[in-house]
A protein has these predicted regions:
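Phosphate-binding P-loop
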Residues: 17-23
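Hydrophobic anchor at the beta1->P-loop junction of P-loop NTPases
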Residues: 28
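P-loop (Walker A) phosphate-binding loop of NTP-binding proteins
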Residues: 31
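N-terminal pre-Walker A segment at the start of P-loop NTPase domains
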Residues: 1-15
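Electropositive, glycine-dotted interaction segments
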Residues: 86-218
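Conserved lysine of the Walker
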Residues: 36
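Short, intrinsically disordered, charge-balanced linker/junction segments flanking boundaries
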Residues: 221-225
Length: 225
């Protein structure tokens, strides 16, 4: 499900970004260090929260690295996502024992009024993946959960010699495209064989940037790149 708006406060280099509207395609343009990667990393953090690995994610680099200019300037992070008539918000707070915890977590529904259901407060880990257990309305929780689970983060910019996108993969590793694109060759071959219209659409869009591109080389092999 498409995200309509996002609000970010106190996260890394982002002091305050309120009700930022997102379209079907959004391009972030700016010099190195202005916060493009930090904006994308919000969704990486959300993935860790969903899998109950917030502490692992934040302790590796230290909670201060996630706060805007560290704890001397910022004590809390606030994230809010609006999608359709539904929403999700979370406040992360720094504790005295140097942990970033979930101070408050809500799922929301927007109609004539804003319906807010708090999933929990002052928790080491998020309850997002268990929203149907803690929400008053199971139906709204299921819908919100389904929307959030559909968001996938793909990070393809690594073009080094050790990049996984340049590695080999098994031909049958093609059900879903992995976030690091390590199985992109197998996935493209499946599109070519079973969903040609999507494959052709990819080739067409690449050719708009590189007119000389005519398609990928498709060959049969159990392991290939």
């Amino acid at each position: 499900m498409k995200i309509d708006e996002i609000t970010v406060e106190g996260y890394k280099s982002i002091k305050s970004l309120k009700n930022f509207k997102l379209n079907n395609i959004n391009i972030l343009i700016g010099a190195n260090g202005v916060g493009k990667s930090n904006f994308i990393s919000i969704f990486k953090m959300l993935n860790f929260m969903f899998s109950k690995n917030l502490q692992q994610h934040t302790q590796d680099k230290g909670p201060d690295s996630f706060l805007y200019y560290g704890r001397k300037t910022t004590e809390k992070i606030y994230l809010e996502f609006k999608f359709g008539n539904n929403g999700y918000s979370v406040t992360l707070a720094l504790t005295q024992n140097n942990k970033l915890i979930v101070e408050r977590e809500n799922i929301k529904y927007y109609s004539s009024t804003e319906w807010i259901n708090t999933l929990g407060t002052n928790m080491l880990e998020s309850r997002l993946s268990q929203a149907t257990k803690y929400a008053y309305s199971k139906k709204i929780a299921q819908y919100s959960l389904g929307g959030i689970k559909s968001w996938k983060l793909y990070h393809f910019h690594d073009t080094s010699d050790t990049s996984k996108i340049k590695g080999v993969c098994a031909e049958n590793d093609n059900l879903i495209l992995k976030p690091d694109a390590s199985n992109i060759s197998a996935y493209l071959k499946r599109l070519y064989s079973e969903h040609r219209e999507y494959y052709d659409y990819i080739v067409y869009n690449i050719s708009q940037i590189a007119p000389f591109f005519g398609g990928f080389i498709i060959r049969d092999s159990e392991i290939y790149n």
